Every structure is written in structure tokens, then in C-alpha cells.
Amino acid sequence: MALDIHAHRILILDFGSQYTQLIARRVREIGVYCELHPFDMDDEAIREFAPKGVILAGGPESVHEANSPRCPQAVFDLGVPVFGICYGMQTMAEQLGGKVEGSELREFGYARVDVVGKSRLLDGIEDHVDADGLFGLDVWMSHGDKVTKMPEDFHILASTPSCPIAGMFNDDLRYYGVQFHPEVTHTKQGGRILSRFILDICGCEALWTPSKIAEDAIAQIRAQVGTDNVLLGLSGGVDSSVVAALLHKAIGDQLTCVFVDNGLLRLHEGEQVMAMFAENMGVKVIRANAEEQFLNNLAGEADPEKKRKIIGRTFIDVFDAESCKLENIKYLAQGTIYPDVIESAGAKSGKAHVIKSHHNVGGLPEEMNLKLVEPLRELFKDEVRRLGLELGLPYDMVYRHPFPGPGLGVRILGEVKKEYADLLRRADHIFIEELRKADWYHKVSQAFVVFQPVKSVGVVGDGRRYAWVVALRAVETIDFMTARWAHLPYELLETVSGRIINEIEGISRVTYDVSSKPPATIEWE
């Protein structure tokens, strides 16, 4: 009987914290499967999920306010360990008979908590030991309310001068609560605390590993697809590349990929995709050269959102035309990943805002009547990358910087023209090449060049040049929600600028974008 890598699972209830997905990623890193669900998850669904433990995440609400979120009673009836984090601790305290009040002194940022109670959760975990033998932890706080009275039979776990009950526990029930955030890297021992709860207290086995995920996904694909044929839109990005490798391993020649070359790709990208998948891996790939169709449809349009929609519609037209030439296709594969699923579920329930629609083949006409295969829908991006390496994809492909679905179409400000795309492709290639040479490519999270439709005077030799301006953009980020502009060495910027201006006749000036997010976004359009 095949190993069920989902058997040992953790349920995470989301109360609206910006850190909730981070908790899930930390649990997965420990090697245990988990799922995120809204705080008002149905009691029957909780029982059917049958978790080995439950984590109550943080949230922006105040427990003592009317209609604030509450944990379902079913969680406390399961008889499994429960770990409340920040708001999760507060609602646990309130619901089990304790009391929560607003605090005059709010705690945001770094703090040191004293570990004052001996519990299974924090036993032997510390950052400091003072002269009196008191253990201390360096943690990240983000709260305005605090627990002022614990439920019956609970004990104080940790405290700070302004928050005497910064943690509480009941070892008999295996209920724990902390006011700080163990999931963020600023809490130095956060990983150990979560591991202690999940592996030791909940008794989970670390079954969620790249090799086991690959085996499970291949088995699931074969069971779902059988002998039918599958179609995949291959973009060359990480998600679709991993899906292609996974499907090819699972069903071989039953997979056909369509690679749409829209004329807005990076330098040599089309050739690289074909070489990797068609030549090296033996995947059936149809290359649709549609540059002229995309550029004709984009002609005269300068509005960023309208450009995105034109590119999306044209992609669907080209993909649909190619797929109609194929026979016996029953399934459409997509690179949907877990954050997409979470965002979609939140949008349907009204509990989250849709950031933007995803540019993929999800908008294909319904008359295609294909069933979906989404082998990555349980995985976060970092898990997709690790799975790609497990499947034998090159490191440089798996850890390539993000590239927007509309490609260079949103890195050319204003109207898109072939001349602009060709210049931008070459400039971007030089920037990335020099970042790699200087060992900076993997130190930054994303780097690219933006084409600006303005001209600037330059001097080349004895001649005057009036040519286009480009901007270099490089950022450092963990989650792409916030980002800091990368402080690249001046010598590196000088080299990149010199090469672009000297090697590309149509560019006379190079600027460097020093805007962080917020207030700026990472992409210019």
C-alpha cells in the first residue's frame, strides 16, 4: 500500500493575519502537510479533515469587540493539540473562560520574553539565560490587546514587562498560546518552537518531502488521467516547467505542450525552452510563432491594463487555434499553485481581496470542454522549486527570477513596438549576464530592465546620439509583498551601463530605479 503523505496533517485557521501563509510554509518546511482554512470553517469539515493538531493564526481584530472572529468549538472538541498565535491565543483564552483587554502599551517589533513556565513547548529552547537562571527568547511582537486572565488550569508560559501573560499553556490538554510570532525569521527560535509543537506534541511524522511529493503527484496524475491525452500551455516559467516535467514523467507521450512565442520573451528564451523540453527531455512541444499577431493587436495601445487584456486574449486565441489541431485531448494541465487556490477561495467567500487575475490558460473558452489537471495546487512556490530540482530540472531554470505573464509588454512603457522589444531584450540580457558574472543574480530577488519611450542626447566618439532611455530595476524581498531596492555596487552598475550604451546603438542613457515597495510597485506597469 502506497504511503499517504497527507495522513499526518495540521489544520491552520486564518483570522486575517498577513503572516498566515508564512505559518503554512514553515509547517511544510518541517516536513508535515498542512492546509489553510478560514476561521469559520464548518464543524463537520473540521472533523472530516481529522488533523493531528490545529494552529490558530493571528489577525487584526480585537477579541473583546462585538462580532470579532471566533474559533469553531469543534476544534476544542477534537482532543488534539491546539497552538494559538497572537490573536489565536487571545480567542483561545476568551473562549475557554479567560479574559482579553486592550493594552495601553502596544508591542510591535522586536521584544525579549522571559520564559517563566516549564512546558513541553519551550522546554530547553532559549536565546539567553540571565544570572538568575531565567530563560529568555528574542521574538517578534505585533499586538495591541493582551490576555489579562487565563482559562482555568492554564499556566503562564512567558511574559514581558508590558504583557505579563505573553504565553500560556496547559500540558494536560496540550493547549498552548503565545503572543509573539514564531513563524517570522525575527523570532530566532521560531522554527524550533513550531517543530516542537508539530513533531513532538502533535506526534506528526515528516512525510512531506520533495521525493515523496513527486511520487505522490505522479501516482495521482496516472490515476486521474489514465490513458487520455493532456494539453499544457508551456511558458518557460517555473510553474509550467515543473508541471511539464512532472506530467512527462507520469504519462510520457500522452502529454502535448503548446509554447506560444508572443515576441515579448527574453533573449533566446524560445530556443532555450525548446532545447530543454523538446530536445533534452523528449517532451512533445508545439511552438506557435505568433509575434506578428501579438504586436499587431497591441499597436497603438498605451494603457497598461488594456495591454494586459490584449495579450491575454491573443494568447487564448493562439492557444485555442493550436489545440484545435490536436486529437483526443481530454485534459488541460495548469500550473495553479496553493497561493492561487487560497486567493480564489478567499475571493469566493468574500474574505479576501483579489489582487489581480492570473495570466494563464484559465481563461480558455468553455467550449473546449476539457477537464483540469493541476498537480501543483497543494504547493507553495518554494516547494515547486524544490520539486523541480527533484525532477532533474536545472538549478538556473528553477531559481530564475519571476517574469510577468505579459512579458516585455509591461516592461515597455506605453505602446509596444518590435523595435522597443528588440532593444529591451538585449539590454535586459546584458544586465542579467553581468549580475551573474558578479555573483549578484541570486542575491537579488528580481532584476530587469524597463524601456522608457523618451529620448536623450548622448555622445559617441565625435558624434551626437539622440536615442532611447532604459531603467535598471533590482529588488530584494522575501514575499514580494514588500521589497527594498537592491544596493548594487557602483562598479557593477557602471559596467552594465557602459555595456548597454556601447553595445546597443538605440540606447543613449541608463538610469537605476531606487524606489522601494511600497510606495512603488516592483514592475513599472
Curated annotation (Swiss-Prot):
Q: Which UniProt keywords apply?
A: ATP-binding, Glutamine amidotransferase, GMP biosynthesis, Ligase, Nucleotide-binding, Purine biosynthesis
> Superkingdom of this entry's organism?
Bacteria
Function, as annotated, reads: Catalyzes the synthesis of GMP from XMP.
Q: Which PROSITE patterns match?
A: GATASE_TYPE_1, GMPS_ATP_PPASE
Q: Name one GO molecular function term.
A: GMP synthase activity
Pathway involvement of the protein, from the record: Purine metabolism; GMP biosynthesis; GMP from XMP (L-Gln route): step 1/1
Q: Name one GO cellular component term.
A: cytosol
Q: CDD domains recorded for this chain?
A: GATase1_GMP_Synthase, GMP_synthase_C
- Catalytic positions are 86, 181, 183
Q: Where does ATP bind?
A: 235-241
* Species classification: Bacteria, Pseudomonadati, Pseudomonadota, Gammaproteobacteria, Pseudomonadales
Q: Which SUPFAM superfamilies match?
A: Adenine nucleotide alpha hydrolases-like (SSF52402), Class I glutamine amidotransferase-like (SSF52317), GMP synthetase C-terminal dimerisation domain (SSF54810)
Name this protein carries in UniProt: GMP synthase [glutamine-hydrolyzing]
Stored PANTHER family: GMP SYNTHASE [GLUTAMINE-HYDROLYZING] (PTHR11922:SF2), GMP SYNTHASE-RELATED (PTHR11922)
Q: Which organism is it from?
A: Pseudomonas fluorescens (strain ATCC BAA-477 / NRRL B-23932 / Pf-5)
**Domain GMPS ATP-PPase spans what residues?**
208-400
* Any matching Pfam family: GMP_synt_C
